[in-house]
Amino acid sequence: PFVTTGDNVLAVMVYKWSDGTYLEDQDFWRLSGIFRDVYLLGVPKTHIRNAAVTAVPDDSFKNGLLSAEVELASYDGSAAALLRAKLLKNGRLVCETQIAAGIEERKNACVTFDMTVENARLWTAETPELYQLLLEIEQDGEITEVQRVDVGFRKVEIRDRRLLVNGV
């Protein structure tokens, strides 16, 4: 359904360096280009390009504060879309928000939102409590894309020369 008669766009991005470059260079092979498996991902013409999510507890370590910056892109002229964000815990809806966004053709639109989760279950290595953030794009009453981001509320800090996770 994504390849049609006429002109189609296939974009390939190759990163020469990454934060894993040092590990990959341990065998002293310094190659650039594509030398591993490649996957093609079909996306709708208006889609989620990137999502950056931060989830931390508040100062009392009781409630969770979630902030997200979602980048939307459109390849089909100017588009109006509704971004709906649902936060789930074990399949149950914890909180929800929605934001209307207008996207110009071949440009990106950045949408930001915040959520507060009362009595949030905090993530630790011993109790890896995760929430599921569902990001949905709706156009003309139809959901065209859904992306899931697993998030955990935690705060890691160094205080008084001690490494603390969630204040402990």
Question: Can you describe what each PLM-predicted range is?
Answer:
Residues 1-168:
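Secreted/periplasmic carbohydrate-active enzymes, especially glycoside hydrolases
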